[in-house]
């Protein structure tokens, strides 16, 4: 609203005005305003957007502006490399090709509007599944100084057991002898162990990979780098490939599956409950160049508290079911987005 807007937002927008993103337009964060102004309330737009008011059907033009072909015409007129941008005057020189038939415009826009709503619904489903999984993870695991988690699985009442990390896992220090493996991995907090090339679009590893640790599918790695939301680093299991190599800055390990279930442990490390064990042995102030000052010995001396193997497997099965639903929802959401892009290519020139 106008009274709440910053000084750079000075232009009053009206119902059905289209706001086109002028900075980094390839992101397609465009918007069609659907709220009428009143005598007591006016809406304004940032100067980072071009304000478009059309005599054609607004929804139809909005979808046309989101096509890849229109975006290509915009990008060739942009200036700047890191933050490519187009001004309103240059944007106005782009020719639009569209059907003048208002009935056809209406049918096309209604179809694409319905698809947009379905995509938004699917995104909400995905987000809700992520929230559900995160909430369960925080309830069914507990830190080493807590007797039991907030929630126990029905039918399981036996006390949890506290273990040193060295009791249920062993360090991996196998080097990539003879450069057997060339796939360099990195830990991305949200995506797990992934190819460095695909994540950074380049390799930042040494040319000589013989000194790197060799990790196999199902084994774990701890990244001592901390970042916003990950104050104690991240632990991830290698799931997406058979093997890869990691910098010696990582602590790599495999688990004893007679004590801890692999899937259970994977979800445990998605929780915050293991942070307590690490904070008990780490020097809070010892953070060097973005790395926690945690020695290998200290790391394997951290304490963790787990239920019986039977309860672990039930917890893992429950969380795996939610994860599968989440994956299916993500795939379906991607199908809807691809369907929309296909329709945009077919319905607009």
Which sequence ranges carry the predicted segments?
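DNA target-recognition patches
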Residues: 1-6, 169, 173-206, 245
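Short, solvent-exposed loop/turn positions at domain surfaces
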Residues: 6-7, 80, 113, 203-209, ...
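A short beta-sheet element
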Residues: 8-68, 211-274, 287, 295
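Non-catalytic DNA-recognition/assembly elements of restriction-modification systems
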Residues: 152-177
């Amino acid at each position: 609203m106008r009274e709440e807007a910053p000084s750079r937002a000075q232009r009053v927008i009206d119902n059905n005005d289209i706001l086109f993103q002028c900075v980094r337009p390839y992101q397609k964060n465009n918007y069609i305003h659907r709220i009428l102004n009143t005598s007591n309330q006016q809406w304004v737009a940032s100067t980072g957007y071009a304000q478009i008011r059309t005599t054609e059907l607004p929804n139809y033009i909005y979808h046309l502006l989101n096509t890849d072909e229109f975006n290509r015409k915009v990008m060739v007129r942009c200036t700047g490399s890191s933050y490519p941008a187009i001004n309103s005057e240059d944007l106005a020189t782009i020719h639009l090709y569209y059907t003048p038939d208002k009935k056809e415009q209406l049918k096309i826009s209604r179809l694409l509007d319905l698809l947009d709503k379905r995509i938004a619904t699917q995104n909400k489903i995905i987000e809700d599944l992520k929230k559900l999984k995160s909430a369960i993870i925080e309830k069914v695991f507990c830190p080493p100084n807590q007797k039991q988690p907030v929630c126990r699985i029905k039918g399981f009442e036996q006390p949890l057991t506290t273990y040193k990390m060295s009791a249920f896992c062993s360090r991996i220090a196998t080097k990539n002898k003879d450069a057997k493996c060339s796939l360099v991995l990195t830990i991305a907090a949200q995506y797990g162990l992934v190819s460095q090339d695909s994540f950074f679009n380049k390799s930042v590893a040494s040319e000589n990979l013989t000194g790197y640790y060799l990790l196999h599918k199902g084994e774990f790695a701890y990244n001592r780098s901390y970042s916003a939301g990950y104050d104690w680093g991240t632990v991830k299991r290698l799931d997406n490939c058979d093997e890869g190599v990691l910098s010696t800055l990582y602590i790599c390990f495999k688990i004893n599956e007679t004590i801890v279930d692999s899937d259970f442990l994977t979800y445990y490390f998605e929780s915050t409950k293991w942070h307590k064990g690490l904070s008990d042995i780490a020097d809070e102030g010892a953070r060097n160049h973005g790395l926690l000052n945690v020695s290998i010995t200290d790391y394997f001396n951290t304490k963790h508290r787990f239920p019986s193997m039977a309860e672990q497997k039930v917890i893992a099965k429950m969380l795996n079911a939610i994860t599968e639903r989440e994956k299916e929802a993500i795939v379906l959401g991607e199908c809807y987005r691809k369907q929309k892009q296909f329709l945009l290519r077919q319905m607009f020139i």
